[in-house]
């Protein structure tokens, strides 16, 4: 009896010790401590790195699992550093640029929304392939490019990439935008840095981002007021607002704002009718809007008369001329600094990066 108990104990002990071991190896991996990212796990071994992406829409499942190695020996492995990747988003291209890895990008999508001159020039000169629309990429162009990996952003219930997924090219899902805190998303820079051989540099950048972000949070926490904040504007009769579980809602709180729709449960954006939003928005102190192209308040009211009831001053960002979308996902401290300067001018913060400007046109009747 004692012999059987000893055997069972030995088996349990053996299994428990295999938790962070690579497949087919007795080596114990070193798990990288992620301080904020909830959907990312990185375990390093002597000859490769294993990365697991948790499914943000079903947290009991896995969105992707990758084995990064300098050798292609072994099924399911991705050779790093990437040499010719298809990077669908300007957000991630901007990060590759910051990490001095422009040469690792062989193709991009949605060129019309790129504000990065290096990549526009690359497409014009034929060094970078234009792969078309990110939701329906050009299959022929991808085949011609023959990238070593494809980096798209996943969307819930989108059906994936269709025939592209059958090409046999590794697909690395860039689900960083589904993290529920700004620093959680920014921490993904550590993953992307490992894809392009810039791990130490990426870790250093994130450390600086974290330090500055927390410093700014402390300053905003000491502010004596909490202005009521209204974000975004309606589109086609609907007003999509950040839910309480989104990184945007967390950012507003960290900036010392009272987000008027912090009661919205869920993650990501929540679409509401314009009427429902305006009922509460009339109490806003500050209205911030991101808009692709020029913005005119009188035209907004002409298009949607209900907006005349909102008297809050507008601060807007023209995303066609600024690098808001390219810079701030992995540098939330830059956006936080700008928002604190808008919400709490009494703190005397002078932002190095300015994305929002006051919209000069006053609301009708003022």
How would you name each of these model-derived features?
Residues 1-24, 339:
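Bacterial Sec-dependent N-terminal signal peptides
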Residues 17-93, 201-230, 342, 347-366:
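Bacterial Sec-exported substrate-binding components of ABC uptake systems
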Residues 75, 80-84, 95, 127-133, ...:
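Second-shell loop/turn segments in exported
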Residues 92, 108-117, 159-161, 175-190, ...:
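Extracytoplasmic ligand-binding site segments that recognize negatively charged/polar headgroups
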Residues 132-137, 154-158, 179-186, 200-207, ...:
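Soluble non-cytosolic domains of exported or imported proteins
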């Amino acid at each position: 009896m004692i012999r059987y108990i000893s055997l069972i104990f030995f088996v349990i002990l053996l299994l428990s010790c295999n938790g962070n071991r690579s497949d087919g190896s007795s080596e114990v991996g070193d798990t990288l401590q992620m301080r904020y990212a909830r959907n990312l796990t990185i375990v390093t071994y002597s000859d490769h790195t294993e990365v697991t992406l948790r499914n943000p829409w079903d947290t009991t499942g896995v969105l992707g699992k990758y084995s990064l190695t300098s050798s292609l020996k072994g099924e399911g492995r991705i050779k790093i550093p990437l040499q010719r990747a298809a990077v669908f988003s300007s957000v991630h291209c901007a990060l590759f640029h910051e990490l001095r890895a422009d040469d690792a990008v062989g193709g991009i999508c949605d060129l019309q929304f790129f504000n990065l001159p290096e990549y526009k020039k690359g497409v014009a000169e034929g060094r970078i392939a234009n792969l078309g629309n990110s939701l329906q990429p050009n299959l022929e162009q991808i085949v011609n490019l023959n990238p070593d990996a494809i980096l798209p952003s996943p969307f819930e219930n989108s059906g994936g990439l269709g025939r592209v997924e059958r090409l046999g090219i590794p697909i690395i899902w860039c689900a960083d935008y589904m993290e529920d805190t700004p620093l959680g998303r920014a921490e993904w820079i550590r993953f992307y840095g490992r894809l392009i051989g810039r791990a130490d540099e990426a870790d250093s950048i994130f450390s600086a981002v974290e330090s500055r972000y927390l410093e700014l949070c402390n300053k905003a926490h000491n502010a004596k007021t909490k202005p009521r904040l209204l974000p975004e504007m309606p589109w086609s009769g609907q007003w999509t607002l950040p839910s309480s579980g989104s990184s945007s809602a967390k950012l507003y709180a960290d900036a010392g704002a009272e987000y008027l729709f912090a009661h919205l449960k869920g993650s990501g954006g929540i679409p509401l009718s314009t009427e429902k939003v305006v009922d509460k928005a009339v109490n806003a102190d500050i209205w911030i809007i991101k808009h692709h192209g020029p913005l005119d308040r009188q035209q907004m009211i002409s298009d949607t008369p209900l907006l005349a009831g909102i008297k809050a001053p507008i601060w807007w960002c023209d995303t066609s001329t600024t690098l808001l979308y390219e810079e701030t996902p992995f540098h939330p401290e830059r956006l936080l600094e700008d928002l604190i300067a808008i919400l709490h001018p009494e703190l005397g913060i002078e932002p190095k990066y300015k994305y929002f400007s006051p919209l000069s046109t006053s609301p009708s009747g003022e």
